[in-house]
Amino acid sequence: MTVAQIHSDCSSSMLPRHIKDDVEPIHLLGFNIARKPKWLQFVLLSGAIFILYLGYGYMQELIFKLPGMKPFGWTLTLIQFVIYSGCGYAECAVWHNTKRMIPWRIYGVIAFFTVATMGLSNASVGYLNYPTQVIFKCCKLIPVLIGGILIQGKRYGWIDISAAILMSLGIIMFTLADNKVSPNFDSRGYIMISGALLADAVIGNIQEKNMKKYGGSSNEVVLYSYGIGSVFIFTYVVLSGEIFSAIPFFLENSWKTFGYALIFSFLGYLGVNVVLTHIKVFGALVAVTVTTLRKALTIILSFLLFSKPFTIEYVYAGSVVMLAIYLNLYSKNKASWDHMIRIFVARAMGYHAVATKKDPMMV
């Protein structure tokens, strides 16, 4: 090799190069937090979940406290779907793509059940004690388990079945407590929220099955399911005549209807995205723990901020549901939880070092 070649190689090696950044971006409300310490990422994402969803729950209950709002749950859902669709399109256009992978007919089915889930859930708030609605939404495992068996032919173990039984017991206890203390007990609310849970179970199974089959992304599913769902809801509110009563009511109270609905919808959309990011970064177990604590705080704040009757039976029922949720989590993460339990017991008994060396299950 000549001196000139060596000089050329050395010079080229000293030139600045564009090195590909291997750190995968982690977006929180448009900001990349990938280079922040892990503990700070957890604090930021968890804090965002609490703020967004506590605000979402507060706005949802506040809207239905408006005199005369009770019959217009589907109009509120229409506004929510339009905003979700617009946000979904903007997100896909900027960060992803709007290409459709899943067939239209599948999206028609997904959109129908998405409409049923969110529409019935929103409408039920007008007829239910809000904490009861939150407790019911915590118990999605029951219809998901049934849907998994019927739609995908899945088989579940005794732990999952036990969790579903405990959830059913918790719901029954909450309903009986509601019936005991609520002066405006209305069975229509329970029918609506039960229908929402059943539809939600069907959605999850259909989405999972077809996203795997056709390779569709979660962003694509949000865009098309909410877009088509908006058309479904608009057709329904026109044919039922609800829209013609809702428009004068919304215009008469424009800030407290359109304003609250916009805030409610944006908080909901951002909340969904933050939860998905939390799952991606820290896993489903940690994310479910955070969201479960958030739901518990939502129930507490509902009792503090909005006057409603209270009984200690609510606490008992909520505790049973919480136990069922973590029993279900244990079923999904049995191997890792068993490992952590063994380590904890070993440390507590003072033979951690010996156990980790000799017990093959501790390795």
Curated annotation (Swiss-Prot):
GO terms for molecular function: 3'-phosphoadenosine 5'-phosphosulfate transmembrane transporter activity. GO terms for cellular component: endoplasmic reticulum membrane; Golgi cis cisterna membrane; Golgi medial cisterna membrane; Golgi membrane. The keyword Transmembrane helix applies. InterPro entries: SCL35B1-4/HUT1 (IPR013657). It is found in: Golgi apparatus membrane. The chain crosses the membrane at residues 39-59, 63-83, 106-126, 131-151, 157-177, 187-206, 231-251, 257-277, 281-301, 310-330. Its main location: Golgi. It is a multi-pass membrane protein. GO terms for biological process: 3'-phosphoadenosine 5'-phosphosulfate transport; transmembrane transport. Pfam families: UAA (PF08449). Keywords: Golgi apparatus, Membrane, Transmembrane, Transmembrane helix, Transport. Belongs to the nucleotide-sugar transporter family. SLC35B subfamily. Mediates the transport of adenosine 3'-phospho 5'-phosphosulfate (PAPS), from cytosol into Golgi. PAPS is a universal sulfuryl donor for sulfation events that take place in the Golgi. PANTHER family: ADENOSINE 3'-PHOSPHO 5'-PHOSPHOSULFATE TRANSPORTER 2, SOLUTE CARRIER FAMILY 35 MEMBER B. This is Adenosine 3'-phospho 5'-phosphosulfate transporter 2. The lineage of its organism: Eukaryota, Metazoa, Ecdysozoa, Nematoda, Chromadorea. The gene is pst-2.
